[in-house]
Every structure is written in C-alpha cells, then in structure tokens.
C-alpha cells in the first residue's frame, strides 16, 4: 500500500505540467531589481490548537492520556533576513540569518528521553542561525558557479523550496521535516549551474554526527553540534538535478551519501567507532505543478543508515550526563507526500485582475522515521499518516494568510492527533 502511494506520487509528478520555482539555495540572489546590494527575507506567524495530549509519555501509555485537555501554541516558526552583494566580475556574496521561534534566551523543556523531567536549555525555545553565508564565482553566464561557505543542502522538496509561499500548510510539510534536517544547511563547497531547461548542483560537505540521531527524527538532528566548528572527520556529498522541459512543470531528483560515526570531537579511532561507518544513503524525487490555476506538489523520500543497530551503544550516548540522545535509531526512514490547491479567484475577473488569489487545498502524507532493524524493539507510533485541508489567501503576491485543519492518524492503541492552525507569512525583497 505504501509503495503504491509512493509510485503514484512519482507518476503524478511526471504526468502533470509547472512553472519553475526558485531553488532555496538561489533565493539570496534572485531579486528582480538587479541591485548590487540586496535585502530581503521571509517570516511566519503561527497560531495553533492541538486536540490531543502533550504529555511526554502519551505514546508509552496512550490510554492514560486519552482524555487530557487540548493545548495551544503561538509561535514564530521562521523569520529570515537575506543580505546579498554583487561585487562584479562574477563575484557575489550571499547570507541568510534565521530566527527560529523568536530567537534565543533561556528556556525549560520536557523530554521523554530525560524521564519527563524539566531540563534547562540556554535558549529561548528558539535559535538564531546563520543559515547561509557564501562567496561565489560565476562562469559562462551562470552555466557554472563555484560557491564556498555555509550553504543550503537542497535534498528533498522541503529543503530546496522551504520558504512559506512554497507550501500550503501553516507549518512545513511534516514528513521530510521529521526525517532529515530542515532547513538543512552546512559548510562546504558547491558546484551548480543553469542550462536551458535544467538546473544541477553537487556539494561536498562535512559529515553528519550519528550521536545526534534518534528514533523520532532519524537523522534530522545530525547537523547539530555543540562546538564552534563542524567536525569533519567524515564527509558527505549531495546532488540535485531539476528539469523544466514541460511548461509549468518542475521535476527534481536529489540525494545524499556520507558516513556519520566517529564524526565528532574528540575522535575515538581505537574504539568501537573505528569498526563502524554509519553510512547514510538518502534519495528523493519531487515535483511542482503550477498551471491551469492549480498548484500540485509531491515528493517521495527513502533513506538507509548502516550500523543503525549499534549507534545506541556508541560512546557518549549512554551516560546520564551526555548531551546526546539515548534513543534507538531506525535503519531506514520513509516520507511520501502530495498536496493540491485550486485558485478560486481565478474565476472572478476583478480579483484575478487585482492579482489576488484564494487557494482551497488538501494534503496527504505518510512518514516513518523508525523503520527498525529486526533486532530492535518495535515502536508503532512512529508510523504516521496525516491529512490536512485548508485555504491560502494572497492579498498580494508576497503575502499569504493560511488556515488549515490537520489530522494525524496513528495505529491503535495510539490516539489520533487533530489540530487547527492559522498563520500569516511574507516573502520578498526590499532592495
């Protein structure tokens, strides 16, 4: 059943037609004015009510928390500032500063891994990150570009097109956002370019850190590190190619490969880590259709992690004072999603002429970050299906007001997880 959903998403992407999106890695320098100095960005405000328990033990003893009251959250998921400069002679600089959930400070949180105890974090429930900072030299009118610095890793639909005007739901699509870093950004070297009807990119990166992997997020936290540098004992490579041959259709293929064990500070080259690799192989196919007043997007992702069974026993993971996860880690992960929306205002001449849009949409996704090794304990709650329906209203091309009803379906005896979400977002350049 799940394979049929995956292949249906792929086939649908190949049979439809869409307008090219700007790859997120190019956003910093995609302004229309052509100014040497550019300023832009995007931001999101989200208001949510969840009609299920937020107790950290709700998956361990679901019956006990079935009647817990609903809970609400108001947040700023992402606020981003772009800064770019064109030095001339093919040299450019791009940067992107991101404030997640309001920035940093001091906060408390509760985690199942910590036995549900309150844990102090040196953060304000959020982060301030330099998501991009790079220097680039372009050749042959952009057919080849060499970019060095901190760059977006465009693996999967969500990372390549993560700005809020590129998805219908109030929050980023859950599947990819769960199993891989999002937004995925690392320091490395990128070779990329545009040809007629094609865009390509290959990247050489520092490896991910297996000590940060966990059951509920697979390799999602693999880019985290507590140091002032990215450990690069091991390396990774990513690649992406997009095709725009058909009017209104973009089809993309992307992937990542790298080793993750013993990619931390200090190395333990003589211990168990020296015998293990933690090789990550991840592949994704995605598409976007923007034609005939429809927008349809879809993606199918699958990943494999070698030595997953042994990661839980790596040095540094089992100590009570360890900052790393104590979880089991799945050997595979999967995420499949598709969404479609129709612009009702396209049928009203006055609103169409005013460039206003009103999409009614639906989204379905299935994801599982913990496809286990047969020797590992089963945790059936990691298998989730999600259905979301809602609307997007664009009073201006750069601003969207969103509303959706989302419902996660979990296997019995776990409780389903419905929620209502409202949001507003902007995306654009000021200079």
Model-derived features: positions:
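Positively charged n-region of N-terminal signal peptides that target proteins for export
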Residues: 1-5
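N-terminal periplasmic/intermembrane-space "pro-region" immediately following the signal or transit peptide
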Residues: 6-59
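Active-site glycine- and acidic-residue-rich loops that bind
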Residues: 182, 228-235, 275-279
